[in-house]
Design a protein with these regions (language model features):
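Short beta-strand-loop/turn "lid" adjacent to the catalytic site in phosphate-handling enzymes
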Residues: 34-36, 52-90, 101-102, 185
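Glycine-rich beta-strand-to-loop/alpha-helix junction loops that act as flexible
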Residues: 63-68, 112-115, 261-270
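Glycine/charged-rich beta-loop-alpha catalytic/anionic-binding loops adjacent to active sites
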Residues: 80-82, 87, 126-134, 281-288
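Conserved phosphate-binding catalytic cores of ATP/NTP-utilizing and phosphoryl-transfer enzymes
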Residues: 86-110, 249
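Short gly/pro/ser/thr-enriched loop/turn and capping motifs at secondary-structure boundaries
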Residues: 95-98, 117-118, 296-298
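Glycine-rich phosphate-binding loop of actin/hexokinase-like ATP-binding domains
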Residues: 105-155
């Protein structure tokens, strides 16, 4: 028996077809399938034209952004139209993250990518979900909010002037074009999140410079950049903890020790900023970070095979 697993965001969907022995028969990508944004025809066209499988699956598990409780029947109906002989299930990307990270164990599952989300999970169901609210009102710790904090810092002087010039040169943008991207162009959240790789690169360059560069002034400038950015990222993750994770810890039954709950993360931001993330959760708040994954597919395959 084969199982088709999908992990879908708004921009792309990752697919994997596996057999009961755990052998991966197919992996591929299609456009993102978000039922909140796409019509039935749009979704059916993606499934019919972009997904070519070597064999028909017996089971389909689709995890996606936009798959709310009210959207589940519609998404499952569309999947059933494409795979009429299969047992089909559609669930939220958050439940997918919890299953990938924690399996059938209880804990706190977090997504830190372009956006942010989290939940308290009992090993089967999501018990609590702090509303993420999006990058304008919330999404603390996300790539979009890191980008927002960075731009605020370089233009208001909280971050070094040399870092501002470095970013403008790296991005090929100036102040008016940045304002245009944020306030007048669509998908500002994706632009803001695209700054995260620059932040990560700057934080790592100081180690490379210290090892290979004899220019002490250059090394000192890089160190200044790295320290300022590290502090900013720690602040972002601290806000994520305080505003999203604290409610779960407060809700845990008094007979349980909240600090015994493990916390796990999936997403590019969690992956690339693992050190400051662990600093906040393990050193500052004494929680156990059990796992950090860049993407959930490996964990989802393991979950559905065991």
């Amino acid at each position: 028996m084969t199982t088709l697993i999908a992990d879908s965001g708004s921009t792309k969907t990752d697919w994997a077809l596996v057999d009961d022995a755990g052998q991966i028969l197919f992996t591929g990508k299609t456009q993102g399938i978000n039922p909140f944004h796409l019509s039935d025809d749009d979704i059916w066209k993606i499934l019919a034209e972009e997904l070519t499988l070597p064999e028909v699956p017996a089971r389909v598990f689709f995890y996606g952004s936009g798959v709310t409780e009210s959207m589940k029947p519609r998404m499952e109906h569309l999947l059933f139209q494409q795979f009429p002989q299969a047992e089909v299930h559609a669930e939220s990307d958050l439940l997918g993250a919890a299953r990938a990270l924690l399996g059938r164990r209880s804990g706190i599952a977090c997504i830190l990518g372009t956006g942010a989300n989290s939940c308290l999970y009992d090993g089967e169901h999501i018990l609590l979900n702090t509303p993420p609210l999006g990058y304008i009102l919330g999404d603390e710790g996300s790539g979009a909010v890191l980008g927002k904090m960075f731009l605020n810092g370089i233009f208001k002087g909280a971050l070094p002037e040399s870092l501002k010039q470095e970013y403008l040169s790296w991005s090929g943008l100036d102040y008016p074009s940045i304002i245009n991207k944020v306030y007048r162009q669509p998908l500002a959240n994706r632009y803001l999140a695209s700054i995260a790789p620059f932040i990560s690169m700057q934080m790592k360059r100081v180690e490379e410079a210290a090892a290979s560069d004899n220019s002490s002034q250059h090394t000192e400038t890089l160190r200044l950049h790295a320290e300022a950015l590290h502090q900013m990222v720690v602040e972002a993750f601290e806000q994520f903890y305080q505003r999203n994770i604290t409610p779960y810890l407060l809700s845990v039954d008094s007979s349980q020790n909240a600090s015994s709950l493990s916390v796990a993360f999936v997403g590019s931001i969690a992956h690339y900023f693992e050190q400051p993330l662990r600093q906040v959760f393990e050193q500052h708040h004494h929680l156990t970070v059990s796992q950090i994954l860049k993407a959930p597919m490996k964990g989802l395959v393991s979950y559905h095979l065991h």
